[in-house]
Structure formats: C-alpha cells, structure tokens
Amino acid sequence: MDTDGDNDVFGSGNDTRNNDDKKKEEMKQNISDNSQIISTRDHEADIIGSISKEDLSKIVVRVDRHDALSANDVQSFREAMINFMRDKDPNRNQPSDKLIIAMEVGVYQMVINLGTSAKLGNANNLEFTIAYDQETRTYKVADFVNYMQSRMRNSPNVVRQYARAMEKTINNIRSAGIINSNGVLAAKHGVLASYRNSYSDFAVGFGNDTTDAQLTSLMLARKQALCKGEGGSVEHYNTMQLANLKHPC
C-alpha cells in the first residue's frame, strides 16, 4: 500500500498547523513588544528619566499669573509712577527716593481704602496725600489711575493687577501697622467689623500666607456680591460654611 500520498497529506497538514502556530506566537510576541514600547514611552521615561537629580535641581521655572503684573511689568509700573510724580510737580523735579517709597506705600493705602475698581478713574473728587519728613504731595485718585492706565494699556485695570502682584508686601506693611483699612469699603462689601482690616478687594485668597481672617473677609464679601440685588437675606456664616458656599440667591 502506497502511503507516500497520505504521508505527504498528513505531513503538509502538520506543516500548515506548525506555520499557523508560529504566526500566532509571532503575533503575540509583537503585541507584547509593542505593549512594552507603549508602556515605557511616557513623559517621565523619555525626558525626565534621562536627567540626573543634580541637573534637575538646576532648573528654574517661573510662570506669571494671568491676573497680576509680571516682575517686568511691576518695574514698568513703578517707572510710570515716578514719571507721574515728576509731571505733577510744579517744577517737574525728580522725586527723592524717600518720597518715592512714601508714594508706593500711599498707593497701597489707597487700594485698601478705596479698592481697585476701574470706576476710580472717574473719582475726580477723591484725593490721597503722601508725606515724608517735610515733603508732602497730594494727588487726585482719578489722575493717578488714568495716568497709570494710559501708560500700561496692555494691562486691564493695571492698578488692581499691580496690587495683586504686591499683595504679600501690602500684607506685611499692613501687619506692621503702617497702613490700615478705614473699614468703609469692607463694610460696603458685607464684611463683618472684626474682619474689615483684613479685607482687600484685589485679593483672591490663594496664597500660603493668607490668614484665616483674610480668607474669611474675602468669603464674606463674595457672599455679599452673590446676593446683591437678588433679595438675599442677611445672615452670619462661619468659615466652614463660607468655604462650602455655592450661589445662595
């Protein structure tokens, strides 16, 4: 009996199955290899993982806030402020360094008492006075606000953005008792009497050095703003309630 044909058939079948098995194994291996490539092709492995800790420690990153002046813009603001002082001097004299510092502190006091609303540009009846030793200067609030805005047109409400950039300095000077809130703006914004000296309308309450009193005053003002004109009732809230406050009106 000739079995060569059968052997050829069976042999061919075995070869086919073996080839199929090989292809399956190759596919599995390819999938495994690709998965390994994908799993290791992440940001850390490709970039940071190839940098030593020593090199990483040398990297310095600074990202500007979108709602506050950058360090360069703060410098531009100060230069414009000095020019404002010179332009308002009857003899156009350059102000002394001491008077410039007094002016800066005076601006801090102004934004605490009057706030940083763009409407200050229309406050022609309001003035602020600075003095150092025998030097005294008085300026109209509207003149100052409009002058600064005209010099820094790319920064909406530049006085507010400047105050936000200088918030830590303002808080330090306030803590030292050099400047204090008169409480009028805070009261108008619904802040309780015990928190009024901690309130600033330009603060957003995100800083690590933000005190509980500052945060509470800010949230009280937000509560007042949410309910203003909506018939909201007058209520007292504790800090935890305010932190969880959604639109109540």
From Swiss-Prot:
It is found in: Virion. GO terms for cellular component: helical viral capsid. InterPro entries: Closter_coat (IPR002679). Residues 17-28 have a biased composition (Basic and acidic residues). Residues 1-33 are annotated as: Disordered. Keywords: Capsid protein, Helical capsid protein, Virion. The keyword Nucleotide-binding does not apply. The keyword Magnesium does not apply. Its main location: virion. Belongs to the closteroviridae capsid protein family. Capsid protein self-assembles to form filamentous capsids, about 650-850 nm in length. This is Capsid protein.
